[in-house]
């Protein structure tokens, strides 16, 4: 089985990674080309897919204030952090990571679907605010 993550260095989410992901996942036809030329505003992005990127830390997502779906599965994330500004998030996938504590989710009051399977969870914290 091909597993490209093992050969890559651990990565932190930076502007370049996010711009590349947004560009790759945006519309590919003429409208998409226009958006790439003019620059896509992160606040306009509703869905972001960052799976299989060897991400070690969640970071630089504060600009995605209207994000509704975030896919961070199959990385090497150890801690749930950097999500406090994503109040509109409805769907979050953090499965297949190295997370030990469920934390940092208390501001995600619209969260409906949270996937955390296949992690190293031993402690659950700060879920009281969530319905």
Predicted regions, residues:
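Canonical leucine-rich repeat
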Residues: 58-61, 80-83, 102-105, 124-130
């Amino acid at each position: 089985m091909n597993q490209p993550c093992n050969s890559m260095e651990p990565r932190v989410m930076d502007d370049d990674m996010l711009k590349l992901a947004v560009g790759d996942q945006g519309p590919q036809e003429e409208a998409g080309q226009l958006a790439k030329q003019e620059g896509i505003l992160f606040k306009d992005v509703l869905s972001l897919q960052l799976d299989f990127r060897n991400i070690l830390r969640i970071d630089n997502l504060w600009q995605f204030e209207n994000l509704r779906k975030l896919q961070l599965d199959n990385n090497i994330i150890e801690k749930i952090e950097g999500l406090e500004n994503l109040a509109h998030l409805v769907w979050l996938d953090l499965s297949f990571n190295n997370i030990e504590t469920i934390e940092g989710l208390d501001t995600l009051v619209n969260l409906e679907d949270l996937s955390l399977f296949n992690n190293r969870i031993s402690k659950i914290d700060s879920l009281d605010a969530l319905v």
